[in-house]
A protein has these predicted regions:
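Glycoside hydrolase catalytic-domain context in secreted enzymes
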Residues: 1-195
Length: 195
């Protein structure tokens, strides 16, 4: 239940601060794609269903609600929104995305991210939003999760990086790299992409 989760994270945090040599606090991260993935929290429709609304205000409010529920249990970081552009229908994670349109994904993703992060840092109600999955994760070869993305630079920049660019410009706190590779280079080690 949420109370047990909060109690456990508080105990870990207290230990890290009071009983370790450097006293560095732990940053707790939680999955928050369409609700905080924990017992006793609100579950919203998947991102693909949310996309049919085109409702930025609703996405902002949903982001706020998810952030509050995660913060009440001790989280500092929320994994979401998923900004992947999904154009491989065999991919098993399409429902985590807002679909195949970069403009729609950018619009709703930025609103969701802003709701999660809020206007004021450290207010106890918001957390850092983590944009997922950088980059071109929604077009895995043969639909296999984590498989390489066969994509040219023009399409990468015009479609697949567009939502991330908009969210970073709007103040996104963190980004999660994807598990795939582009042109044979894993995204997690792709110096060109990451810098």
């Amino acid at each position: 239940n949420p109370q047990s989760g909060a109690k456990a994270l508080n105990a870990l945090q207290k230990y890290a601060i009071d009983s370790t040599r450097l006293g560095i606090p732990i940053l707790f991260a939680e999955e928050c794609p369409h609700g905080h993935m924990a017992i006793g929290t609100t579950v919203f429709p998947t991102s693909l269903a949310q996309a049919s609304t085109w409702d930025k205000e609703l996405m902002y409010k949903m982001g706020e609600t998810i952030a509050l529920e995660a913060r009440l249990q001790g989280a500092n970081i929320g994994y979401g929104p998923v900004l992947d552009i999904a154009r491989e229908p065999r991919w098993s994670r399409m429902e985590e995305t807002f679909g195949e349109d970069p403009v729609l994904t950018s619009t709703l993703g930025v609103a969701f991210m802003k709701g999660m992060q809020g206007e004021v840092q450290n207010d106890g109600k918001h957390l850092f939003s983590t944009l997922k999955h950088f980059a071109a994760y929604g077009i895995p070869e043969s639909g296999h999760n984590g498989a390489r993305a066969n994509i040219g630079m023009r399409q990468l920049f015009s479609d697949y990086l567009h939502p991330f660019k908009k969210a970073v410009e709007a103040g996104a706190g963190t980004i999660m790299t994807s598990y795939n590779s582009i042109d044979g280079v894993p995204c997690t080690a792709n110096k060109y992409l990451l810098s």
